[in-house]
Amino acid sequence: MTHSIWHEKIKSFLPEHYYGRINHFLDEAYASGLVYPQRENVFKALQVTPLEETKVLILGQDPYHGPKQAQGLSFSVPEEISAPPSLINILKELADDIGPRDHHDLSTWASQGVLLLNACLTVPAGQANGHAGLIWEPFTDAVIKVLNEKDSPVVFILWGAYARKKKAFITNSKHHIIESPHPSPLSSYRGFFGSKPFSRTNAILEKEGMTGVDWLK
């Protein structure tokens, strides 16, 4: 299901048999209708970014709910898919902050230790937040709690009111939080643009003696 170290750590923050409940939920959801992302990509964020390599978290709310968009990484879409509005604004801020990036697929961020996690890992087709409050929040809250226990610093990038509520789980003074309004068109001009999260993240990592992220890769 996930990278084994993630699995063992996450389980310690969940009720007994919670993984079984998740699997039952997934069986029913995928049998009853069209759900994104593809089932094999539900836990992709944890599969491609091992716990021991994670140094940044970018928290999204739930997967894109349009055809072929969601790929299991927050805000990312496959290269051949047009960038949704939030991703357009993320790339615009990146261009203003560090430089232009033409790729819509953010997998190269994930491979550098940037955990691209959504709070809900599935969504029914065409129904934003359709699986909110059903199964995922205790699981993804546990992921944040696992990161909070890390001895090495993690930069938590929290965009929007929903993500910022998760600050309650980040109590370890070794870690750093960068927060701003959400990059969606509704809120991007209220403080997301100009917030420079990418250069600020690298400045923190380098100050901590860690390698910065090549955001343009």
From Swiss-Prot:
Cellular-component GO terms for this entry: cytoplasm
EC number: 3.2.2.27
Subcellular localization(s) per the UniProt record: Cytoplasm
Catalytic activity: Hydrolyzes single-stranded DNA or mismatched double-stranded DNA and polynucleotides, releasing free uracil
Active site as annotated: D62
Top class in the EC scheme: hydrolase
Molecular function per GO: uracil DNA N-glycosylase activity
Gene Ontology BP, a term: base-excision repair, AP site formation via deaminated base removal
Pfam families: UDG
SMART domains for this protein: UDG, UreE_C
Summary of the function given for this chain in its UniProt record: Excises uracil residues from the DNA which can arise as a result of misincorporation of dUMP residues by DNA polymerase or due to deamination of cytosine.
Family: Belongs to the uracil-DNA glycosylase (UDG) superfamily. UNG family.
Record NCBIfam families: PRK05254.1-1, PRK05254.1-2, PRK05254.1-5, ung
Protein name per the record: Uracil-DNA glycosylase
